[in-house]
Every structure is written in structure tokens, then in C-alpha cells.
């Protein structure tokens, strides 16, 4: 059997499995407009930057429109093929690596996103090692693809966690894109990955997501401009990780510095978290008061 015949057989089998996996409610319109397409929204060169900011604040300027339904269906197809044939994904950190090398020793404003699997230890105890590797790798790559689709950069994979960051000439758009990405990640888990896993009697995968905004420094460990490891360091990285650790399964938490920059219609979907000083010990670096965190209302 040649490669084309194998592919045709995979697609036919997949469609049968996909029909069974589609026993879920879809919310197709909820996220279609969350992120925006820059190519559709560029203003003519004679318009002032102030006009662009006003339009963006009113929700008129759009950078990228994501077809979330199509993405979820493609996710299902990739996960199914991975489980059956060990399909490999394309590299997704190269873009970030190239970008950071151009900005070594610079301080950059960015929204940082951490997404991590919940209870991965239990998964490792229930499944064969080779299946665990495929599932976790596929999960990480699907999260990375969501980051890329929202004009973000994939910084790195750490165990069963993925770290991304979002930048834009308008930090408000960067914040909106980051939050839209986080929301799509939850949908990908609920509607893309887990239905396929369930068809194999595998347990659901759950995630918790944390975001924060601020300054970070790009550092290079070594003198080789092309090969030495590059990374991002700064308080935003640390706080985003702490915020993520506080999130419940399938929950999105954002720091106040992100909340302040997202569109008012998106802000309405978040509520302030009330934690004791023993639960949350981190203060705002500007005010010295406990740093406020918000959760997305499901």
C-alpha cells in the first residue's frame, strides 16, 4: 500500500471516529471574533496613530479572526493520527528563538502565558509509557499552535507545560490576543483533544492557565550569537507561573496588568479573585499592595 492509499484509509477511518467524537455542544461564535486579523484592519497610511488607538478601544480594529471550529476539527484529526501512527508536528519554537536573538539584552513589554496539565502524574500511572509520550507531546504542540495562531511566540516546553508570550505595537491588542488564545486552549481541550482520547478509553486531560503582563529581559547564555541558549527573565515570568499554579482545572487566571489592558467587553467576563494572604503572598511592584488576579467566568 502506497503513502496516498494509507492517507486515504486514515482519513476514512478518522471521519468515522470523528462522527462519534462529535457528541459535544459547540459554541462556534463565542471565540470567532475574540482574536483579530491585521491584514483586514490596517488603516490607510494617512490616518493618525491616535485614530487607530480610538478604533481599537471601541473594538473596531481587528488583527486576526480565528476560525476556532476549523482549528478544533484539525486538532481532532491530528490527535487521532498521533495516537494511531505517531505523527510528528512541525517545530514551533524557531520563530521565538530568532526573534529573541535580535533583542538580546533588551527589556521588552509582553504578555506571558503559562499553560500546564493538571494531574499529569495520575495519567502516567494509568497509561503505557509510549502512549503517554505521544499524548503529552501532542497536547503541548496543540497549545503551541494556538499561541502561533494568535500571533504569539512559543518560548519553550517545560515538562508538560508550555510557555508563550505575546507582543504587539499596541499592548492592548497583545493582551486581547493572549486572552483569546487562552480561551481557545480550553476549547481545544474540551472539544478537540478529550473527545478523541475518550474514544480510546483514555482519561480527559485538564489544564490550568495563567497570564501576566510586564517587562522582561532577553538574555543569552554564552557568546555564540547563533547557538548559545536565549531565554526571557523577569518578574512577569515568575508571577505568570505563580498565577497559573493557583488556577483550578480548566480555569484561566489573569493578573491585573493584563486585565487593565483587555477590551471592556472582555473584562466583563472576568471576576476578581478573593484570596487570603496565606494563599496569595505577592504584591504589586508599583503599589506595594496585594497583586489582584481575575478569573474567567465560565
Protein language model annotation of sequence segments:
Residues 185:
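Serine endopeptidase catalytic core focused on the charge-relay Asp
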Residues 92-97, 192-194:
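Short gly/ser/thr-rich secondary-structure transition/capping motifs
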Residues 150-174, 194-233:
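Catalytic core of nucleotidyl cyclases, primarily class III adenylyl/guanylyl cyclases
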Residues 1-92, 249-298:
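Intrinsically disordered, glycine/charged-rich C-terminal tails and inter-domain linkers
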Residues 212, 235-260:
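Catalytic/regulatory signature loops of cyclic-dinucleotide turnover enzymes
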Residues 135-139, 181, 236-239:
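Hydrophobic alpha-helical membrane-association signature
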Residues 99-177:
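Catalytic NTP-binding/metal-coordinating core of nucleotidyl cyclase/transferase enzymes
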Amino acid at each position: 500500500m502506497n503513502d496516498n492509499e494509507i492517507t486515504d484509509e486514515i482519513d476514512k477511518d478518522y471521519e468515522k471516529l470523528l462522527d462519534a467524537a462529535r457528541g459535544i455542544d459547540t459554541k462556534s461564535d463565542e471565540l470567532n471574533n475574540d482574536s483579530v486579523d491585521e491584514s483586514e484592519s490596517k488603516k490607510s497610511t494617512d490616518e493618525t496613530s491616535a485614530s487607530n488607538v480610538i478604533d481599537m478601544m471601541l473594538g473596531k480594529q481587528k488583527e486576526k479572526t480565528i476560525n476556532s471550529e476549523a482549528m478544533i476539527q484539525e486538532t481532532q484529526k491530528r490527535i487521532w493520527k498521533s495516537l494511531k501512527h505517531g505523527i510528528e508536528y512541525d517545530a514551533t519554537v524557531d520563530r521565538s528563538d530568532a526573534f529573541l536573538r535580535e533583542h538580546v539584552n533588551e527589556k521588552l513589554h509582553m504578555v506571558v502565558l503559562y499553560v500546564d496539565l493538571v494531574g499529569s502524574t495520575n495519567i502516567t500511572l494509568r497509561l503505557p509509557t509510549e502512549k503517554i509520550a505521544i499524548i503529552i507531546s501532542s497536547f503541548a504542540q496543540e497549545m503551541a499552535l494556538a499561541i502561533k495562531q494568535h500571533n504569539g511566540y512559543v518560548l519553550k516546553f517545560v515538562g508538560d507545560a508550555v510557555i508563550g508570550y505575546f507582543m504587539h505595537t499596541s499592548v492592548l491588542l497583545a493582551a486581547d490576543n493572549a486572552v483569546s488564545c487562552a480561551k481557545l486552549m480550553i476549547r481545544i481541550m474540551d472539544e478537540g483533544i478529550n473527545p478523541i482520547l475518550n474514544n480510546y478509553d483514555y482519561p480527559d486531560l485538564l489544564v490550568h492557565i495563567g497570564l501576566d503582563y510586564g517587562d522582561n529581559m532577553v538574555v543569552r547564555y554564552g557568546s555564540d550569537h547563533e547557538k548559545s541558549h536565549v531565554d526571557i527573565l523577569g518578574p512577569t515570568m515568575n508571577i505568570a507561573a505563580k498565577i497559573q499554579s493557583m488556577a483550578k482545572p480548566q480555569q484561566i487566571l489573569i493578573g491585573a496588568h493584563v486585565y487593565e489592558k483587555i477590551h471592556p467587553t472582555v473584562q466583563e467576563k472576568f471576576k476578581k479573585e478573593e484570596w487570603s494572604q496565606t494563599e496569595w503572598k505577592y504584591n504589586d511592584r508599583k503599589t506595594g499592595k496585594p497583586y489582584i488576579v481575575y478569573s474567567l467566568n465560565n
